[in-house]
Protein backbone atom coordinates (compact mmCIF):
# COMPACT_ATOMS: atom_id res chain seq x y z
CA UNK A 1 0.00 0.00 0.00
CA UNK A 2 1.30 3.46 -0.87
CA UNK A 3 2.30 5.61 2.08
CA UNK A 4 2.22 9.04 0.51
CA UNK A 5 -1.36 10.21 0.49
CA UNK A 6 -4.90 8.99 0.62
CA UNK A 7 -6.58 9.18 -2.77
CA UNK A 8 -10.01 10.80 -2.54
CA UNK A 9 -13.21 9.46 -4.03
CA UNK A 10 -13.85 10.59 -7.61
CA UNK A 11 -16.82 12.89 -8.10
CA UNK A 12 -19.39 11.31 -10.40
CA UNK A 13 -21.25 13.55 -12.87
CA UNK A 14 -25.04 13.50 -12.38
CA UNK A 15 -27.14 12.00 -15.17
CA UNK A 16 -28.43 14.45 -17.81
CA UNK A 17 -32.19 13.76 -17.51
CA UNK A 18 -32.86 13.73 -13.74
CA UNK A 19 -29.65 15.40 -12.52
CA UNK A 20 -29.10 12.62 -9.97
CA UNK A 21 -25.73 11.18 -8.94
CA UNK A 22 -27.42 8.01 -7.66
CA UNK A 23 -29.00 7.42 -11.06
CA UNK A 24 -25.67 8.10 -12.81
CA UNK A 25 -24.05 5.44 -10.61
CA UNK A 26 -26.89 3.02 -11.41
CA UNK A 27 -26.39 3.66 -15.15
CA UNK A 28 -22.71 2.78 -14.73
CA UNK A 29 -23.64 -0.47 -12.95
CA UNK A 30 -26.03 -1.45 -15.78
CA UNK A 31 -23.54 -0.52 -18.52
CA UNK A 32 -21.82 -3.35 -20.40
CA UNK A 33 -18.87 -3.04 -22.81
CA UNK A 34 -18.78 0.77 -22.35
CA UNK A 35 -22.20 1.26 -24.00
CA UNK A 36 -23.43 4.07 -21.80
CA UNK A 37 -26.16 5.39 -24.11
CA UNK A 38 -27.72 1.91 -24.26
CA UNK A 39 -27.59 1.67 -20.46
CA UNK A 40 -29.25 5.11 -20.17
CA UNK A 41 -32.05 4.05 -22.54
CA UNK A 42 -32.65 0.89 -20.49
CA UNK A 43 -32.81 2.78 -17.18
CA UNK A 44 -34.98 5.65 -18.42
CA UNK A 45 -37.43 3.24 -20.09
CA UNK A 46 -37.57 1.10 -16.93
CA UNK A 47 -38.16 4.16 -14.73
CA UNK A 48 -40.90 5.43 -17.07
CA UNK A 49 -42.60 2.03 -16.95
CA UNK A 50 -42.41 1.92 -13.16
CA UNK A 51 -43.65 5.52 -12.75
CA UNK A 52 -46.55 4.73 -15.10
CA UNK A 53 -47.59 1.68 -13.05
CA UNK A 54 -47.10 3.25 -9.62
CA UNK A 55 -47.89 6.90 -10.44
CA UNK A 56 -45.01 8.17 -8.30
CA UNK A 57 -41.84 10.12 -9.06
CA UNK A 58 -39.09 8.14 -10.83
CA UNK A 59 -36.37 8.85 -8.28
CA UNK A 60 -38.65 8.18 -5.28
CA UNK A 61 -39.35 4.67 -6.58
CA UNK A 62 -35.66 4.01 -7.29
CA UNK A 63 -34.68 5.23 -3.82
CA UNK A 64 -37.39 3.09 -2.18
CA UNK A 65 -36.29 0.00 -4.11
CA UNK A 66 -32.63 0.59 -3.21
CA UNK A 67 -33.51 1.17 0.45
CA UNK A 68 -35.16 -2.25 0.61
CA UNK A 69 -32.18 -3.97 -1.06
CA UNK A 70 -29.24 -2.30 0.72
CA UNK A 71 -27.59 -4.63 3.27
CA UNK A 72 -26.64 -3.26 6.69
CA UNK A 73 -24.41 -6.21 7.68
CA UNK A 74 -22.47 -8.82 5.73
CA UNK A 75 -20.11 -11.68 6.53
CA UNK A 76 -16.39 -11.71 5.76
CA UNK A 77 -14.15 -14.76 5.93
CA UNK A 78 -11.53 -14.59 8.66
CA UNK A 79 -8.93 -17.30 9.15
CA UNK A 80 -8.13 -18.04 12.79
CA UNK A 81 -5.81 -20.93 13.53
CA UNK A 82 -6.71 -23.73 11.16
CA UNK A 83 -10.32 -22.82 10.52
CA UNK A 84 -12.13 -20.09 8.61
CA UNK A 85 -14.96 -18.19 10.31
CA UNK A 86 -17.67 -16.14 8.66
CA UNK A 87 -17.45 -12.94 10.71
CA UNK A 88 -20.39 -10.49 10.57
CA UNK A 89 -19.32 -6.89 9.80
CA UNK A 90 -21.17 -3.64 9.27
CA UNK A 91 -21.27 -2.41 5.66
CA UNK A 92 -19.98 1.08 4.86
CA UNK A 93 -22.53 3.41 3.18
CA UNK A 94 -20.75 3.54 -0.21
CA UNK A 95 -20.46 -0.27 -0.37
CA UNK A 96 -24.07 -0.56 0.83
CA UNK A 97 -25.25 1.41 -2.22
CA UNK A 98 -22.96 -0.47 -4.58
CA UNK A 99 -24.12 -3.88 -3.35
CA UNK A 100 -27.78 -2.86 -3.53
CA UNK A 101 -27.43 -1.68 -7.12
CA UNK A 102 -25.42 -4.74 -8.14
CA UNK A 103 -28.01 -7.11 -6.62
CA UNK A 104 -30.88 -5.27 -8.33
CA UNK A 105 -29.17 -5.55 -11.72
CA UNK A 106 -28.23 -9.23 -11.20
CA UNK A 107 -31.80 -10.07 -10.19
CA UNK A 108 -33.19 -8.15 -13.19
CA UNK A 109 -30.89 -10.01 -15.60
CA UNK A 110 -32.19 -13.35 -14.33
CA UNK A 111 -35.87 -12.46 -14.85
CA UNK A 112 -37.94 -13.75 -17.77
CA UNK A 113 -39.41 -10.59 -19.35
CA UNK A 114 -38.63 -9.70 -22.96
CA UNK A 115 -36.39 -6.64 -22.69
CA UNK A 116 -33.89 -5.59 -20.04
CA UNK A 117 -35.92 -2.42 -19.42
CA UNK A 118 -39.01 -4.49 -18.54
CA UNK A 119 -36.95 -6.85 -16.36
CA UNK A 120 -35.42 -3.94 -14.47
CA UNK A 121 -38.82 -2.27 -14.11
CA UNK A 122 -40.27 -5.48 -12.68
CA UNK A 123 -37.41 -5.88 -10.23
CA UNK A 124 -37.62 -2.22 -9.13
CA UNK A 125 -41.38 -2.60 -8.54
CA UNK A 126 -40.83 -5.81 -6.55
CA UNK A 127 -38.00 -4.27 -4.52
CA UNK A 128 -40.02 -1.15 -3.72
CA UNK A 129 -42.76 -3.46 -2.37
CA UNK A 130 -40.20 -5.42 -0.32
CA UNK A 131 -40.31 -8.60 -2.38
CA UNK A 132 -38.37 -10.10 -5.28
CA UNK A 133 -34.99 -11.75 -5.82
CA UNK A 134 -32.82 -8.79 -4.80
CA UNK A 135 -34.64 -8.38 -1.47
CA UNK A 136 -34.35 -12.14 -0.90
CA UNK A 137 -30.58 -11.84 -1.45
CA UNK A 138 -30.39 -9.15 1.24
CA UNK A 139 -32.44 -11.28 3.62
CA UNK A 140 -30.08 -14.22 3.01
CA UNK A 141 -27.02 -12.07 3.77
CA UNK A 142 -28.64 -10.73 6.96
CA UNK A 143 -29.65 -14.26 8.01
CA UNK A 144 -26.06 -15.44 7.46
CA UNK A 145 -24.74 -12.58 9.61
CA UNK A 146 -27.30 -13.36 12.32
CA UNK A 147 -26.34 -17.04 12.31
CA UNK A 148 -22.66 -16.19 12.73
CA UNK A 149 -23.16 -13.54 15.42
CA UNK A 150 -21.11 -15.72 17.80
CA UNK A 151 -17.97 -14.93 15.79
CA UNK A 152 -18.45 -11.14 15.92
CA UNK A 153 -15.56 -10.81 18.39
CA UNK A 154 -13.13 -11.78 15.57
CA UNK A 155 -13.89 -8.45 13.94
CA UNK A 156 -10.99 -6.39 12.55
Curated annotation (Swiss-Prot):
One of its GO terms (molecular function) is structural constituent of ribosome. Keywords: Ribonucleoprotein, Ribosomal protein, RNA-binding, rRNA-binding, tRNA-binding. GO terms for biological process: translation. It comes from the Bacteria. InterPro entries: Ribosomal_uS7, Ribosomal_uS7_bac/org-type, Ribosomal_uS7_CS, Ribosomal_uS7_dom, Ribosomal_uS7_dom_sf. Pfam families: Ribosomal_S7. One of its GO terms (cellular component) is small ribosomal subunit. One of the primary rRNA binding proteins, it binds directly to 16S rRNA where it nucleates assembly of the head domain of the 30S subunit. Is located at the subunit interface close to the decoding center, probably blocks exit of the E-site tRNA. NCBIfam families: rpsG_bact (TIGR01029). Belongs to the universal ribosomal protein uS7 family. Part of the 30S ribosomal subunit. Contacts proteins S9 and S11. This is Small ribosomal subunit protein uS7.
Amino acid sequence: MPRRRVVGQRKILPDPKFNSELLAKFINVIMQDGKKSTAEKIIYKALDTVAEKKSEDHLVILEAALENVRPSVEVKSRRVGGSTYQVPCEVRPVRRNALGMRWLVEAARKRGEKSMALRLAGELLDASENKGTAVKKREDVHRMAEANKAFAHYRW
